[in-house]
C-alpha cells in the first residue's frame, strides 16, 4: 500500500 500526500 502506498500513501502519497502532497502538502497542497
From Swiss-Prot:
What does UniProt give as GO cellular component? extracellular region
Using the record for this protein, list the coiled-coil segments as residue ranges, or answer none: none
Instruction: Give the sites modified to Tryptophan amide.
Output: 8
Q: What is its main location?
A: secreted
Q: Which residues carry this modification: Pyrrolidone carboxylic acid?
A: 1
| Gene Ontology MF term list | hormone activity
Compartments, as annotated in UniProt: Secreted
Q: GO BP, one example? A: flight behavior
Q: Which UniProt keywords apply?
A: Amidation, Flight, Hormone, Neuropeptide, Pyrrolidone carboxylic acid, Secreted
Q: What does this protein do?
A: This hormone, released from cells in the corpora cardiaca, causes release of diglycerides from the fat body and stimulation of muscles to use these diglycerides as an energy source during energy-demanding processes.
| Assigned protein family | Belongs to the AKH/HRTH/RPCH family.
Give the protein's recorded name.
Adipokinetic hormone
Amino acid at each position: 500500500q502506498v500513501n502519497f500526500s502532497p502538502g497542497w
